[in-house]
């Protein structure tokens, strides 16, 4: 679970994690603090100190969601690996259907488009830019998913090793790159409904939202370039 500057949500997340671990004794939860400067990482360490099957990794600098996810999966030995955003966008209730779906697919992604009104309350500009980015990414990269950006994705151990050995981006288009690599590696991809929690808030300003959208477009082109130059070549 990658987190960055989420000090106000630490208690809520820890309660959800503790409840999930009690419900699923086989569950192992790793919180990866991506260089927070508000004490998020230390607070997670304190709150989860006595909670079984949990671990907190502190990254000294902010390197992006992609790096945080890779670090969280680096030493994982479980047969099914799942990452979900640490800002409480999605509840732990998604873990069970994700786990079940991973018995049928190599990769399973959460899709907000499968939940009626899942984007309720989402600012119009954000919704429009998100839809536009998704369609642009799918068109340029030859993939077809109604929701590439939901921070809820699961992998079999074998699929995760194959994907993260090739994956390069650290943020912005990180999720799109993963799905592009799924197609390139011939991995099967399933989808489950991803319901956004009622307490989740979108913190990005309008200016940063537009800048991030432009950065995402740049990274989509970078994915195309890497593919064309053989950077993703199998066995490389």
Predicted region positions:
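Short, well-formed alpha-helical segments that are part of the catalytic scaffolds
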Residues: 6-20
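Acidic helix N-cap motif at the loop->helix transition within catalytic regions
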Residues: 8-12, 38-47
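A conserved acidic beta->alpha catalytic loop
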Residues: 33-42, 88
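Acceptor/aglycone-binding surface of glycosyltransferases and processive sugar-polymer synthases
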Residues: 59-75, 80, 92-172, 199-218, ...
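Catalytic donor-sugar/metal-binding loop of nucleotide-sugar-dependent glycosyltransferases
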Residues: 143-144, 168-170, 179-197
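Donor nucleotide-sugar binding loop of glycosyltransferases
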Residues: 6-9, 36, 65, 91
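Conserved donor nucleotide-binding strand/loop of the catalytic core
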Residues: 27-31, 41-75
């Amino acid at each position: 679970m990658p987190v960055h500057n989420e000090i106000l949500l630490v208690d809520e997340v820890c309660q959800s994690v503790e409840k999930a671990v009690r419900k699923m004794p086989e569950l192992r939860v790793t919180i990866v603090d991506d260089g927070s400067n508000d004490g998020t990482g230390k607070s997670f360490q304190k709150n989860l100190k006595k909670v079984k099957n949990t671990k907190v990794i502190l990254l000294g600098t902010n390197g992006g969601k992609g790096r945080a996810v890779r670090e969280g999966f680096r030493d994982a030995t479980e047969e099914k690996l799942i990452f979900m955003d640490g800002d409480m966008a999605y509840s732990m209730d998604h873990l069970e259907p994700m786990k079940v779906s991973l018995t049928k697919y190599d990769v399973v992604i959460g899709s907000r488009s499968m939940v009626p009104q899942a984007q309720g309350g989402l600012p119009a500009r954000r919704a429009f830019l998100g839809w536009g980015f998704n369609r642009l990414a799918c068109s340029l990269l030859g993939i077809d998913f109604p929701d590439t950006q939901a921070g809820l994705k699961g992998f079999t151990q074998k699929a995760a090793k194959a994907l993260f050995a090739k994956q390069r981006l650290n943020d912005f288009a990180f999720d799109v790159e993963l799905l592009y690599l799924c197609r390139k590696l011939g991995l099967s991809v399933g989808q489950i409904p991803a319901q956004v929690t009622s307490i989740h808030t979108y913190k990005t300003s309008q200016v940063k939202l537009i800048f991030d959208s432009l950065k995402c477009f740049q990274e989509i082109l970078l994915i195309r370039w890497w593919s064309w130059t053989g950077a993703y070549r199998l066995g490389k």
